[in-house]
Design a protein with these regions (language model features):
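Glycine- and acidic-residue-enriched helix-capping/strand-helix junction motifs
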Residues: 13-27
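Short hydrophobic segments within beta-strands
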Residues: 6-9, 13, 43, 71, ...
């Protein structure tokens, strides 16, 4: 399947957009943890804040993705809704998936049929997203995938939460930074990238 993963164009709320142009590490981690035959492209829209519509239109046209995933923080919700409306017009057959802090904490914000999602990945996404792609590819039910919410007609079904992954077991693979289709990440004008060294609270 062809997968397009997008992070929102909004910068951190109290910093100038030009100061923070950092990549979304979660999306490259998703890309690194799907089955190898899927073709995944990651686009951090913070790099194209003045050309969001043009960039998304170009990517949708060139890639014709089957799945489009959006990573959303709460202050980015309006941008996500606008992007979903655009994507519905550009890719009426694509499955639109949202994940990240905001959909995990407020899934009801994404249940509108016009600007809402088809599927919500709640909590840690790597395993849930991989299982989602497998189910969609095989035409299987989504009902047995922990950590998933999915549209059933006009209503959403919320599956049970997925347990937090235990990284010491090696159950997650490394991120795929080569899936990025945009570049030139900077922090205060200097080149930057991100690396995840831990998850969750330091104790407990």
């Amino acid at each position: 399947m062809q997968v397009l993963l997008l992070s929102m164009p909004d910068s951190f709320e109290h910093m100038a957009p030009v100061a923070v142009r950092m990549p979304n590490g979660a999306l490259t981690s998703l890309a690194g943890n799907v089955d190898a035959h899927h073709r995944v492209a990651v686009a951090d829209l913070i790099l194209v804040q003045g050309r969001v519509v043009e960039t998304v239109t170009d990517l949708a046209t060139r890639l014709s993705p089957d799945i489009v995933g959006l990573s959303v923080m709460t202050f980015q919700r309006r941008s996500a809704h606008r992007l979903i409306i655009l994507l519905r017009r550009l890719l009426p057959e694509a499955t639109i998936v949202v994940g990240g802090y905001d959909p995990s904490l407020a899934p009801d914000a994404y249940d509108d049929e016009r600007c809402g999602a088809d599927v919500i990945v709640r909590g840690e996404g790597e395993t849930t997203f991989r299982e989602l792609l497998r189910a969609l590819e095989r035409g299987e039910s989504l009902a047995n995938i922990p950590g998933l919410s999915w549209r059933n007609g006009s209503q959403f079904v919320h599956n049970p939460d997925r347990p937090v992954s235990q990284l010491r077991r090696g159950e997650l693979r490394l991120p795929r930074r080569d899936a990025r289709v945009l570049d030139d990440y900077t922090l205060l004008g200097r080149p930057v990238d991100v690396i995840e060294t831990s998850r969750g609270p330091a104790r407990g």
